[in-house]
Amino acid sequence: ASAARGTGVPVIADGGLRYSGDIVKALAAGGDCVMIGSMFAGTEEAPGETIIYNGRKFKSYRGMGSLDAMKAGSADRYFQKGDVNINKLVPEGIVARVPFKGMLSETVFQLVGGIRAGMGYCGAPNIETLKETGKFVKISAASLKESHPHDIHITKEAPNYSVE
């Protein structure tokens, strides 16, 4: 991000963002915006078929770099538009199913709350301050594990947390 500073070229964080904390980290690292389409997958408003599987509700999800999406027209985003031979396309995404999340507004509400909390942890009232004063601290795998719920069985799912 520092290489782009002052050039007028925005830095876009794209890929690997799963939680609101990841958005805060991307912005603190100098990102100007984030790509969070996969975070919206599974919402009522997201494209995709609603599926019942093993008694639970899911939505189909097609990453823009998936072979299916490329066949449907996104290949030009990956500079492969001229490759009409489907065997020559090089996919960067997948087709899958994701748990149904409810309304988009609920997901956005949770994300905004998480971003505000993350900025609060950093003492940053706005994104510019976050970029200027945000600090990264390396922690061990054991510390990461300890920072999440452990030695329990979750009995009620939270809208902003999932066990992976």
PLM-predicted stretches and their roles:
Residues 1-13, 17-164:
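Alpha/beta catalytic cores of nucleotide-metabolism and tRNA/nucleoside-modifying enzymes
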